[in-house]
Amino acid sequence: MAKKIAGYIKLQVPAGAANPSPPIGPALGQRGVNIMEFCKAFNAKTQEMEKGMPIPTTITVFSDKSFTFAIATPPASFFLKKAAKIAKGSSTPSQTTAGTVSMAQCREIAEAKFNDLNANDLDQATKIIAGSARSMGLQVTE
């Protein structure tokens, strides 16, 4: 018989740097999950990734206090900031530009994030990433 699901927890956890401090500790502690067990499992699963990269994580907590977790690719904004070599996007995207990214860079990011995007083909995924870049105040060049 399948385990009964008690709830889901969605967090953005830095790769290889999960520790029991907030926000991870309180979120898992409320559900009665063993925090250190999650931290060790998460850090082991993300040790090959760039340290500190934000990883969207969905933790499924079962009624017997056990859990499973699924990780997704980092947010598009993380990749775009890295490609444009900037610390943060523009606070007024329609008026000032924070930097530039090429369509080729958008395509690379779309290839990396394709499974997490709601797109049927790579061209649609590239357009989604280019739209994200524009909303961050980045200029998209051909």
UniProtKB/Swiss-Prot annotation:
GO CC aspect terms: cytosolic large ribosomal subunit
SMART domains, per the entry: RL11
Gene Ontology MF terms: large ribosomal subunit rRNA binding; structural constituent of ribosome
Biological processes, Gene Ontology terms: translation
Post-translational modification: One or more lysine residues are methylated.
Listed PANTHER family: 60S RIBOSOMAL PROTEIN L12, LARGE RIBOSOMAL SUBUNIT PROTEIN UL11M
NCBIfam families according to UniProt: L11_bact
Record's subunit section: Part of the ribosomal stalk of the 50S ribosomal subunit. Interacts with L10 and the large rRNA to form the base of the stalk. L10 forms an elongated spine to which L12 dimers bind in a sequential fashion forming a multimeric L10(L12)X complex.
Annotated protein name in UniProt: Large ribosomal subunit protein uL11
Gene behind this protein: rplK
